[in-house]
Curated annotation (Swiss-Prot):
Domain S1-like: 1-72
Protein name: Translation initiation factor IF-1
Organism: Pseudomonas aeruginosa (strain ATCC 15692 / DSM 22644 / CIP 104116 / JCM 14847 / LMG 12228 / 1C / PRS 101 / PAO1)
GO molecular function, one term: rRNA binding
Domain of life: Bacteria
Subcellular location: Cytoplasm
S-S bridge residues: none
Main location: cytoplasm
Family in the record: Belongs to the IF-1 family.
Keywords assigned by UniProt, alphabetized: Cytoplasm, Initiation factor, Protein biosynthesis, RNA-binding, rRNA-binding
Described purpose of this protein according to its UniProt entry: One of the essential components for the initiation of protein synthesis. Stabilizes the binding of IF-2 and IF-3 on the 30S subunit to which N-formylmethionyl-tRNA(fMet) subsequently binds. Helps modulate mRNA selection, yielding the 30S pre-initiation complex (PIC). Upon addition of the 50S ribosomal subunit IF-1, IF-2 and IF-3 are released leaving the mature 70S translation initiation complex.
């Protein structure tokens, strides 16, 4: 899968799950389970409930995603 296949959406963190997984509500109302990208984990970027985030989704599984950016 290449990077062009994925697309990004904005959302809000609704719930924190174990193993750095988060439940994110997207702008369109859908709720997805997302994990932190490797660079965010490496740089110790903390994500809390209520944070605005950018989630990268693939067309293969729209219920899972990767958090690539946390808005301030």
């Amino acid at each position: 899968m290449s990077k062009e296949d994925s697309f990004e959406m904005e959302g809000t963190v609704v719930d924190t799950l174990p193993n750095t997984m988060f439940r994110v509500e997207l702008e369109n109302g859908h709720v997805v389970t997302a994990h932190i990208s490797g660079k965010m984990r490496k740089n110790y970027i903390r994500i809390l409930t209520g944070d605005k985030v950018r989630v990268e989704l693939t067309p293969y599984d729209l219920s899972k995603g990767r958090i690539t950016y946390r808005a301030r």
